Each structure stands twice: as C-alpha cells, then as structure tokens.
C-alpha cells in the first residue's frame, strides 16, 4: 500500500457529463428529433439535472475510495477506525506534567497536607492538579508533588437500557483521560477489548474520537456484563489543553484549594514549579498516524528490536522524538539507551523532558519489554 496515490477528481465533472449526454443523444436519435441544446431548452434542463446528480455521485465514490486506505485517507475519524484493525490507537492530546514545590513560611508542630487532585494554577488561569497527597512533615518547610495539567470532572452520562454494546458520550470535548466509570456506587474496570472476559466481568472500554469527545462502551452480556436497565452511569475524566500546558518555570504559583494540619486548621502554603512543565502535546497528526500505524503493527505488541523500543517510546503520550541505541559504549553488551525529546511550548518545537515524564515513560516500557531486558 506504500506510495498509493489518491484518486483524482478530474476524469468526470459536471461539464464533462453534460457534454457526454449531448453526444449520446445525438448518436442515438440524430438531429431530426432533438437539435436544440441551448440552456433555455427544457430538455437541456433535464440533462443539467442528471449531470448534477451524476457529478455528486462520482465525487462521493472517489471520496469513499480514498477514505478506504490508510495512505490516502484524509479524515481523522476514518484513520482512527482503520487503526483499530491493526491494534493501533492514535495518540490523543496529552496533558503536561511537572514537579511542584510546596512550602510554608515556618515549621509547624504537625503534618501539613494538601490532598490529591488539589488545584493550582498559573496567572493566566491554566489549571494543574496534584497527582498524590502532598505532606509537609512536622518541623519541615517544604515537600514536592507531581502535578498534571487539566481539570477533573465527574458527570452522569446516561441511564442504561439493558441492551448490548451501549455507548455513552461525555458532554465536554478536549478529553485527555477517562479515569473511572461508576455504576450503582461500584467502579467498573477498564479493558482494552472484551475478548477474554465472561458475562460476570464488569468492564468497559473507551474511545476518544477525532473531535476529542470521550465515549464509554459496554459489552454484550457474554464477553462482559451489561449495566442493568435503569442504572445511572457516572464517569470521572480530565479535560486538558495539550501543548499549552508546557509552561515555563516559576509560573504555577496560585493555590486554589486548602492545605490543613492534623487538627484541621487551614495553613497558608506557597507553590511553584522550578522546572518547565513538559509532555503536553496535541492529538497525533494525520501524517504521523499514517507513518506510525504500520510500524506499530510490526512490533506485535512487544519490545524486542531496537526499532520496537523507538516505536513504543514514540507511542507514549508527550514524546515528540525518540532514538534507541544498542551497545553505545564499548564492552556494554546488549544495553539499550533511549534518548527522547518532549513537545515544546509551541507547536513543532521540542524540549528536554523533565524527570516526571521520563519516569512515566520507563514504567510504560516495562509493560512491553522482554523479561531479560
């Protein structure tokens, strides 16, 4: 399929169809029956109407043919659908991450805690949320916690009707992460597919479409349970701003939530990001999808070769460039180094990733590498 050219809409247009119709009429009936093809003629009106319909039909046929192949498709949603066939999920927008320093002006007699998902922000209003509880131990002045750009929402997205393969859309666009689905006060489990599950497994899968709308999909009652008729479905998700979250040092300085000590007293704290936030990226481009989907299929969902490591690193959200090197130094053996760059603050720029992003990438690669690597 490499090098496949798009079908060009040049062989037949409206004018060509009109001309072809007139020639066929002349050949079939001769000039004695119909020789007036001027635009004010009623017969010409019928020819023009037929040409309009035929022109439209040919356009859609060409378009359909182009959208049926990975190399020639131009619509993002069609590419997403084709990538499902080879097990590749195009990268959605990714939120930036950064380490946040949290400090107090003087030591406190008890621990001071800022709970997970507390909101902090830049002066421009860009919101970050802490990923874990941040605790300043008694007698200490500061601690650090990782934070991710974006805002978390919980929403009731619908009511089950008890049928197979129910789908529910999240109301907001810009979804970067679907965190939890709760039905009847019970959290259901995420699954990549329904293949290996039974009717008792309370599972769901998710999709984020070309317009960054999140969708929750349930199974058929055989390979995964169906939510009972009348049950409300609640979803918790994050909405982010992609590359805009790659903010400069010393810009995340506002606290939107409250820190408290062990007695429940409110404690004044300060926050700051001493490093660049990194890893924020826009949805994968159409050109990148066409390039990387075949490469990902060749990995067969495991890291073995040098190219596999590069492919999986590039597949991780927030990584703009990756290069895997084997035996870089003399006497090293089969040691693999992966050099990566994250997305910069502006589109088509790159930056050095922070430690938070690099550690997250290593955890991701651990799921696919060989046990001996």
Question: Language-model segments: which ranges?
Answer:
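Residue-level signal for inorganic ion chemistry
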Residues: 117, 181, 313
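Carbohydrate-recognition loop of C-type lectin domains
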Residues: 2-21, 25, 300-373
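Extracytoplasmic
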Residues: 95, 213, 333-335
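Immediate N-terminus of the mature polypeptide
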Residues: 1-71, 178, 186-268
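Acidic, glycine-rich low-complexity/disordered segments
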Residues: 136-183, 197-198, 211, 215-216, ...
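Flexible glycine-/small-residue-rich
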Residues: 102-104, 220, 237, 326, ...
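Extended assembly-interface regions of large multimeric machines
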Residues: 1-175
């Amino acid at each position: 399929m490499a090098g496949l050219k798009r079908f060009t809409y040049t062989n037949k247009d409206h004018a060509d169809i009109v001309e072809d119709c007139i020639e066929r009429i002349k050949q079939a009936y001769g000039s004695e029956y119909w020789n007036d093809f001027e635009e004010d003629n009623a017969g010409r009106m019928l020819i023009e109407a037929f040409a309009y319909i035929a022109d439209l039909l040919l356009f859609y046929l060409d378009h359909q043919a182009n959208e049926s192949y990975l190399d020639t498709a131009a619509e993002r949603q069609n590419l997403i659908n084709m990538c499902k066939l080879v097990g590749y999920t195009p990268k959605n927008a990714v939120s930036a991450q950064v380490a946040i320093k949290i400090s107090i002006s003087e030591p406190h007699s008890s621990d001071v805690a800022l709970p997970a998902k507390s909101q902090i922000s830049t002066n421009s209003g860009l919101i970050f949320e802490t990923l874990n509880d941040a605790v300043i131990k008694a007698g200490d002045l500061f601690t650090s916690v990782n934070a991710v750009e974006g805002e978390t929402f919980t929403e009731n997205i619908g009511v089950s009707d008890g049928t197979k393969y129910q789908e529910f859309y999240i109301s907001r666009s810009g979804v970067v992460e679907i965190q939890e689905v709760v039905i009847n006060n019970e959290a259901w489990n995420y699954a990549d597919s329904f293949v290996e599950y039974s009717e008792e497994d309370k599972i769901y899968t998710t999709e984020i479409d070309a317009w960054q709308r999140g969708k929750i999909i349930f199974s058929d009652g055989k390979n995964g349970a169906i939510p009972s008729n009348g049950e409300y479905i609640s979803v918790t998700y994050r909405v982010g701003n992609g590359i805009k979250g790659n903010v400069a040092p010393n810009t995340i300085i506002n606290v939107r939530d409250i820190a408290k000590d062990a007695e429940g007293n409110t404690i004044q704290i300060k926050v700051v990001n001493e490093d660049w936030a990194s890893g924020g990226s826009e949805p994968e481009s159409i050109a990148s999808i066409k390039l990387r989907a075949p490469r990902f299929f060749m990995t067969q969902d495991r890291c073995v070769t040098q190219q596999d490591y590069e492919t999986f690193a590039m597949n991780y959200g927030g990584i703009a460039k990756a290069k895997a090197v084997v035996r870089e130094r003399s006497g090293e053996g089969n040691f693999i180094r992966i050099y990566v760059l994250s997305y910069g603050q502006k589109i088509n720029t790159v930056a050095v990733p922070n430690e938070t992003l690099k550690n997250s990438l290593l955890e991701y690669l651990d799921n696919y590498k060989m046990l001996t690597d």
